[in-house]
Amino acid sequence: MWLFYFYFKPSRKNIETNYMDALNAMLMADKRKAIALLSKIVKKDSEHINAYLQLGNLLREDDPDRAIKIHQMLTVRQNLPKEKKIEILKSLSLDYDKVGDLEKAKIEAEKVLKIDKSNHWASSFLLMIAEK
């Protein structure tokens, strides 16, 4: 049994290579390839928070409801660094803004300010929402 797991366990190096390829595809504006690679990564490694974040961010434009689900799922993760929590909440705020749910976008941005009272992005985003 252990031999089977060891032999078929996803290689961390392979996952990181795929992640770098996905980031490169994003830089080259190959959204389709980036989404495919990121999807492959999260299927192999459900703990790869950065891959989930980037996948949701890429999906926001064409499939914002799916982006919301991905980013919501990340909010329940325990023991994340403060910076990662802020990044997740920011992405979720932008997702809600994309679908026109300004109240939920505001709530998520306010959560950012609860974590970091001087967060410039959250303050600017809340001002932008108030002006809509």
Regions flagged by a language model, labelled:
Residues 1-10, 30-38, 66-77, 103-107:
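Repeat-mediated protein-protein interaction surfaces in helical alpha-solenoids
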Residues 1-17, 111-115, 120-125:
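Long, contiguous interaction/recruitment modules in multidomain scaffold/adaptor proteins
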Residues 14-47, 54, 60-69, 91-98:
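Alpha-helical segment of the N-proximal tetratricopeptide repeat
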Residues 40-43, 76, 110-114:
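Conserved structural position within tetratricopeptide repeats
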